[in-house]
Amino acid sequence: METLLENAVRGIPTGCVFALLAVGLVLTYKTSGVFNLAFGAQAYASAAVFYVVRKDHEWPLLWAALLAVVVVGPAIGLLLERVLFRYLRTAGSMAKLVTSLGLLIAIPEVVKLVLGDESRKNPPPLWYVMRTDEWLWPRNTSIVLDAGQIATIAATVTVVVALVLLFRFSSLGLRMRAVVESPRMAELNGVDSERVSMTSWMLSSLLAGLAGVLLAPLFASLNPLDLFTLLVAALAATVFGGLTSIPLTFAGGLLLGVLQAVLAGSLPTDSILATGLRPALPFLVLFLLLLFRPGLRSTREVTDPLATVEAPPPAPVALVRPHWMTVGTRAFGAVVVALGLAACWFLLDGYWLGLVISGIILGIIMMSLIVVVGMGGMLSLCQAALAAIGAFGTAQLVAATGMSVLGAIVIGAVIAAGVGALLAVPVVRLDGVYLALATLAFALMFESIFVPLSWVSGGAVPLSVPRPLIGPIDLADDRWFLLFAVLCAAAVSAVVIRLREGTTGRFLQALQTSDVAAASIGISGRRSRVVAFTVAAAIAGFGGGLMATYVGQANYQSSFPYLIGLVWVALLVSAGARSVQAAVLSGLFFFLFPAILTRLFTFPGNWVESNPDAPSWVASALGAIQPNWAQSVAFILFGIGAITYAKHPEGSIEAQTATSVGAIVRWVERRRGDAGTGPSDPVPPPSPEVTDAPPLAGTGRPTADSGSTG
């Protein structure tokens, strides 16, 4: 019993870590209506500033803390509110979530550009160093609470008490909640919604800064990925509190930390449960809470009763353009692909050819996002994990059974489809934020539990996958593999287009408009979404098997980490989540754009070296440009692209395509009109009797028969 109690007490500091992050998320959601996935990125920004001024410039502790937490943290929140989120108050949950996803990608890269990209080892603590033997509790046990743990506990309790008092007993807390529910109605009651919104974001960002500075010493080096993974682990406490209750969130964080510590003390250190289950416990608890917490699945976001109805995104251009243009576009696309293939075959060296092949394969994986996100309206954040399942299935089948690689790729896709179907059955009951969190929890569970297992990934040494022979053609030659990848992409795109234009695609389009209306005409929303999720998983698994075959091994860390999967989602939704063209171009862009930027950023330094007589100020300015900026600049642009989703939910490529198609159709119709043939699809003008009719009472719409008489 004493051992159990000691383990439970040891879990309190860890629970407070979870609780501090979870309370910060709840505060942001409660005061702005945004489930801020970028909370960890904001925490990283403040922690990086604290590191630089405290350790590099040796500022006093107090001034460094004030700058990082009290100045930089709220300043980031104010900037985000003024530039972005003030325009998203009445937007849907998908737009807010995608915007925060873009910020999650962009903010750490901006910090690296501003403060430098060097490794930051041993982040300095926010507290003064104390002797750890002064913090024994109780004195006659082996429990040790050091200064950092005491500071974390004290900060978490203080924050929770202060926020509870703020929301229960202050007018500011009441105004914050009122502005989230309806900015317009709050303004009618004399509330300055602009000022309240700014205050809310500054307060939540201050808490993010405090969490970042306080928790950074838990890691050997300052890394945004560590803070984000810790944030996702804390999401279980957030869901335990229903995304609104701060006391329940605090209790959930404590319970999670205690449970993890009890498991650590009870399980054998060398057992599979200890090495796999304990690190994955927060993600497993999050997944189970999302599925089974009472009332959570029926929770819907609060909508502003005075807000206008949010229009659905326009129909895909491929479904509404004239038939002659569809035929012409596909013929023109085939010519462009043939010319591009010939140019790659004869002009590119091995490096650039490899990037093109990788981009095409990634385009296939991104086509899975077209099915689940574009057509299904479900923000899935686990497609990288499903692609990894296809890659591991391919590698294991080849290694264990000697099966042909092509057959193993197909069966690997079937395995991924089976996993996707099993995941979809419970997950599709969720929607919006909850579905995105459930798929993210699955991705992290897969990474923590299954990837380390030798029968899944091969263990520490990745499984190799040889390139196959197809008759006399050896795919070990990159040029032949390029042709093979293009043919595979064409086949998958045909499947996606057929699905989009078929019955399932029409059902999914109806479900995006209204579940109730779709159900009234006999459409099963659950069955249609399970089908979409399963097909998307199969496509992702097929792409993962192709990627493993091209790379030569099924390597999770280099090809399929969950954070890279989030970048894929951000990149595709910014380009167009319903367009096959956007998927292929996004895959190519992901690999080619950073490489092109690297070449561009290398040129100034090379020029300075080859021109030693250049003016010193020119040499200094050009020499400051570093080639390693390329990755940061590329990811910043990827994140900014996701932020534009709120303005163009159809995607930038789809929006530009719609503009071009409209211009071409108008030009053709004008030409036909000048030739005396009239427009190709004449639309009769509205009847004046209907247009001039008096409106229906209370609707503003004319009646068809009033005005036609008399």
PLM regions: where:
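Short, strongly hydrophobic alpha-helical membrane anchors
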Residues: 1-6, 134-140
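Short, hydrophobic transmembrane alpha-helix segments
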Residues: 1-6, 26-35, 51-64, 342-354, ...
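Residue-level signal for short hydrophobic patches within transmembrane helices
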Residues: 1-12, 16, 199
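Transmembrane alpha-helices and adjacent helix-loop boundaries
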Residues: 17, 21, 40-45, 90-123, ...
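Hydrophobic positions within alpha-helical transmembrane segments of bacterial inner-membrane proteins
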Residues: 19, 23, 27, 66, ...
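Transmembrane alpha-helix boundary signature
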Residues: 80-86, 110-121, 169, 215-216
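Short amphipathic alpha-helical coupling elements at transmembrane boundaries
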Residues: 85-90, 175-188, 509-510, 520, ...
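Transmembrane helix boundary and interhelical loop/hinge segments in multi-pass membrane proteins
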Residues: 166-174, 178-182, 499-505, 511
